[in-house]
Amino acid sequence: MTISPPEQEASVKIVVDRDPVKTSFERWAKPGHFSRTLAKGPNTTTWIWNLHADAHDFDSHTNDLEDISRKVFSAHFGQLAVIFIWLSGMYFHGARFSNYEAWLSDPTHIKPSAQVVWPIVGQEILNGDVGGGFQGIQITSGFFQLWRASGITSELQLYSTAIGGLVMAGLMLFAGWFHYHKAAPKLEWFQNVESMLNHHLAGLLGLGSLSWAGHQIHVSLPINKLLDAGVDPKEIPLPHEFLVNRDLTAQLFPSFAKGLTPFFTLNWAEYSDFLTFKGGLNPVTGGLWLTDTAHHHLAIAVLFLVAGHMYRTNWGIGHSIKEILEAHKGPFTGAGHRGLYEILTTSWHAQLAINLALFGSLSIIVAHHMYAMPPYPYLATDYGTQLSIFTHHTWIGGFCIVGGAAHAAIFMVRDYDPTNNYNNLLDRVIRHRDAIISHLNWVCIFLGFHSFGLYIHNDTMSALGRPQDMFSDTAIQLQPVFAQWIQNTHYLAPNLTAPNALAPTSATWGGDVVAVGGKVAMMPISLGTADFLVHHIHAFTIHVTVLILLKGVLFARSSRLIPDKVNLGFRFPCDGPGRGGTCQVSAWDHVFLGLFWMYNSLSIAIFHFSWKMQSDVWGSVTAKGVSHITGGNFAQSSITINGWLRDFLWAQASQVIQSYGSALSAYGLMFLGAHFVWAFSLMFLFSGRGYWQELIESIVWAHNKLKVAPAIQPRALSIIQGRAVGVAHYLLGGIATTWAFFLARIIAVG
């Protein structure tokens, strides 16, 4: 940190342009108003595709970084408005169409439902009996558990929150309009990173966490303590009563009677009745102790509030990001981070690339924590919801990571300036890209042959009737000893590091089964040869995804094959006529291919999760012990390719295939429909543009003959457009197929 005399620093001011862009509905109503070419209207059918491709490509509308920044800023408010409207809809469904109050009174026997299908031509078959005399579609979003954790006890509260969501959405829409048309920030405001860090860290994350901690302490904890004790939700005081009447809370948490005295006398241990450090899960709800999570959010708030005061603005004290970056260089890294500050303050694509990669990775980490440390009451025993949120956060993470690579490549093509990046880290990575990519390629080949080879060996030995020669827990063992050591360490360590804690951080490390209502919430997850094998398939598929995406970024500007690639742009089909073998080489094509491998990687990850949990974790608990859904067949079945096909895909597809005539029949139809969407994608991916252009011209000839020729000339999709439509349907079809397969199965057996 440095302290500088104030006169050296340019003082930070909030500067805006008043009324920079007039609000014109006439202009907005004109399709393609953002582009001179598109505004002329369509000559061919390509126009509508270009309209969609370029509507949000602000770089193509203008070269003015200030205007681009304002458009991005304004679009963020639009995004927030959409999120608030969506949230409002979720809360409204909870208020209007759900059995939330019934579920709250008996969450172990009644299933969550927030959608009732109207009887038009027999669809009411979808309204299954979810218990408590309610017929509806069983939902797996986890909202009921979240509402219970936040202390919502009635449908009126859900209505109020839904209205609040709409009010917030309106505010966001207004803010998006206001900050583009009425008071638009100047470029220097967007580039003032220290203020931005201070405000986002202290305001958004610090005060945000503090507000949530406050809500948890004053509203959620007392209400949940009463709910856990079996008090009828209708008898529980309303949230504001806990706020205005301290005695009410003090009956549940005695330290409340002492007020703020322990805080100001530094006698903080007094508050340990509602800020706990228990570890493990609440045996009543199977969720984390809410007093632990309140403590966690309070601690996080303190950290972020401190972090939000670290950066130097008008007071001449604190860190400067530019100074930190430029001072940060090692003995072997040339100019180090010099030049990176300029990249990150002038290229939104560079910013977005880093944020997407980190946010995507975080989403996948969240997916793992949601089952290992289920944060909400009764979440862990709702297997459909557990499977859904794991799958959801995994897919979201994958798309974000691929998006990170996409925007890194766009940055390389559009925003990278070689003259400002001599011998810094980025330049050095680009200069030894051949070594990086060829080594990564070798790693992929090694992992691919060895991981797949282990399975092929097992399939062969199994077919030859030689189980003693297979890699398995009962023959040739390949135990994941490192993973087992980590598990054991995490199980034993709290004895030393947190001697007063009741349990380690997660029941997955070791210890006893946590059961709620006769179902397993969480228990130690034993790892063996089967996990070792599939883990290496994960390593293989992830490395291939990284290889494709990183190659796209590092070779976005040039390669030995096409030295002037940067002049061709981010997406192009081939390097012009007369240069065979230069197709599918653009940065865009690497993103396109990376998406398929992302899909491969994550399909295997969610399949692994689904089967492992059904086999080794989820199940019912009786006096005789735990009875798992698939009876622990993962260890012996998943060690062959045939086992995955027969005992996972085929065996567990029976529920979706036989769902007709039951409340799950929609999943059967979706399973078929999504397969169709997926197959439809192959039409775009396997055939070339010329095939379609030829067909179209024949069809146009027929129209001309009949004098019904269109005014807008029909044209085949461009090569890139065809691939984009193809990959979109491939992923949509694949994900929806998996969704139907998972949910029909887990709702039927879970």
Curated annotation (Swiss-Prot):
[4Fe-4S] cluster binds at residues 574, 583. It is an enzyme of class 1 (oxidoreductase). PANTHER family: OUTER MEMBRANE PROTEIN, OMPA-RELATED, PHOTOSYSTEM I P700 CHLOROPHYLL A APOPROTEIN A1-RELATED. Its EC number is 1.97.1.12. This is Photosystem I P700 chlorophyll a apoprotein A1. The lineage of its organism: Eukaryota, Viridiplantae, Streptophyta, Chlorokybophyceae, Chlorokybales. It comes from Chlorokybus atmophyticus (Soil alga). The PsaA/B heterodimer binds the P700 chlorophyll special pair and subsequent electron acceptors. PSI consists of a core antenna complex that captures photons, and an electron transfer chain that converts photonic excitation into a charge separation. The eukaryotic PSI reaction center is composed of at least 11 subunits. GO terms for molecular function: 4 iron, 4 sulfur cluster binding; chlorophyll binding; electron transfer activity; magnesium ion binding; oxidoreductase activity. One of its GO terms (cellular component) is photosystem I. Chlorophyll a' binds at residue 675.
